[in-house]
Design a protein with these regions (language model features):
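Acidic/histidine-rich catalytic cores of soluble enzymes
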Residues: 23, 33-34, 132-199
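Surface-exposed cleft-lining segments at the edges of enzyme active sites
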Residues: 87-89, 120-125, 147-152
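Short glycine-centered, acidic/aromatic-flanked micro-motifs in structured strand/loop junctions
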Residues: 5, 38, 117, 150-152, ...
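Short, small-residue-enriched loops and turns at beta-alpha junctions
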Residues: 42-44, 80-83, 120-123, 154-157, ...
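Glycine/proline-rich, positively charged
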Residues: 124-134
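N-terminal pre-domain/capping segments
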Residues: 1-108, 112, 125, 142, ...
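Juxtamembrane/interface motifs at transmembrane-helix termini
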Residues: 112-113, 186
């Protein structure tokens, strides 16, 4: 059983606990696997040298997961640009940003990365852009033995038929979904959860 780091996002964001205490906390709670959240590491997100910061992230977490005999399972990638954007330059930049985390997941012996598909409201354009980005990232991830999985994360990404068109349209066996069963709200206002926001 693995633990999502997001379960303690308030604790880590408050600064009272380092995100690098995640392995220790999960171990003490009886979990065996770790699901990391990229946005919870300010030493990475605020770094002027992102590749080096991610490399340090990998080194530290590999040491900690080994120390506590934990398995690295997943990295949830946030705030690395819009993979579904119709601005081609922005979309391609986002792809390159995500590749850094896919390589990190490989170096940590994870099985998957989770990404978001934001950047376009028009359904047809969103599907087209999403398919291109998913196909590119899945091709990059395949030889690294990493699965590329998409979370329904509010707004258009929570439209299941459209999301599955994007997933299936990639035609990649290592591309799939990470369902969040509390996140099927399509509202543009608020986070998009059935528990708050406009839903």
């Amino acid at each position: 059983i693995s633990l999502a780091q997001w379960s303690f996002h308030r604790t880590f964001r408050s600064g009272e606990t380092s995100p690098y205490d995640f392995a220790k906390m999960a171990h003490e709670l009886g979990f065996e696997g770790l699901e990391y959240v990229s946005q919870l590491y300010p030493d990475v997100t605020k770094s002027s040298d992102k590749p080096l910061a991610i490399q340090n992230f990998v080194t530290k977490n590999n040491m900690l997961s080994a120390e506590y005999k934990m398995q690295n399972v997943l990295i949830m990638i946030d705030e690395e640009g819009d993979l579904s954007s119709s601005n081609e330059e922005s979309r391609l930049t986002s792809i390159e940003n995500h590749k850094l985390w896919i390589k990190a997941a490989h170096d940590m012996k994870c099985s998957s990365v989770r990404l978001n598909l934001y950047g376009e409201k028009d359904p047809e354009k969103w599907i087209e852009n999403s398919i291109k980005s998913l196909a590119t990232l899945s091709d990059y991830a395949a030889p690294l033995n990493i699965n590329v999985i998409v979370e329904n994360h509010g707004r258009i990404t929570s439209n299941v038929p459209l999301l599955m068109q994007a997933i299936n349209g990639s035609q990649k066996s290592n591309c799939g979904t990470l369902p969040d069963f509390g996140n099927f709200c399509l509202a543009e206002e608020g986070y998009g959860s059935i528990f708050n926001g406009a839903c």
